[in-house]
Amino acid sequence: MVDEIIKSMQSKMDKTVDALKKDFGTIRTGKANPMMVEDVRVDYYGTLTPLNQLGKIACPEPRVILITPFEKGMLKDIEKAIFAASLGLTPNNDGSSIRINIPELTGERRKELAKVVKQKAEEKKVAIRNIRRDANDELKKHQSEMSQDEVKGHQDKIQKITDSYIAKLGDLEKEKEKEITTL
């Protein structure tokens, strides 16, 4: 029973860490990253479809994203969708693929992005703490079936797991901030 609570908690925390990685992937750092555009929704025969399902997204150079659609007829729609997504990126349609040159970040923009990184990391840390609270609440429901020492031991275990996930988020945050602030 306690193992199930901990397993469920770790699963939720893993998803939270993955969500932060995904959030960070969408933040423009001056380097090309396919994650910047892969979730852009394109009108594909009346259905809004993620760009990564309509073509191959690659980064042939450090500051270039190359999108090669599976259907050449989709080039105009993909171009429109990238403009509509307000990513601050300018797609160049060469007739067979779309190239996006990633401009250098200004010092001011780097500071803004560093703040966004801190904010997103803090949101996920709060989510991790909420997951911990839920796990402790679940543990309290089964308190009558255990001794106080067992309950305390399980709470300590939950806290150690929480601390390790908070540290993971902190590492991801530092890594992304370094990526943004490095010229």
From Swiss-Prot:
Lineage top rank: taxon: Bacteria
Keywords tagged on the record: Cytoplasm, Protein biosynthesis
Pfam entry (one): RRF
BP-aspect Gene Ontology terms: translational termination
GO cellular component entries: cytoplasm
Originating organism: Leptospira biflexa serovar Patoc (strain Patoc 1 / ATCC 23582 / Paris)
Gene: frr
Disulphide linkage map: none
Record has Flavoprotein as a keyword: no
One Gene Ontology MF term: ribosomal large subunit binding
UniProt-recorded name of the protein: Ribosome-recycling factor
Residue segments, region Disordered: 134-156
Protein's cellular compartments: Cytoplasm
CDD domains, per database record: RRF
Family: Belongs to the RRF family.
Described purpose of this protein according to its UniProt entry: Responsible for the release of ribosomes from messenger RNA at the termination of protein biosynthesis. May increase the efficiency of translation by recycling ribosomes from one round of translation to another.
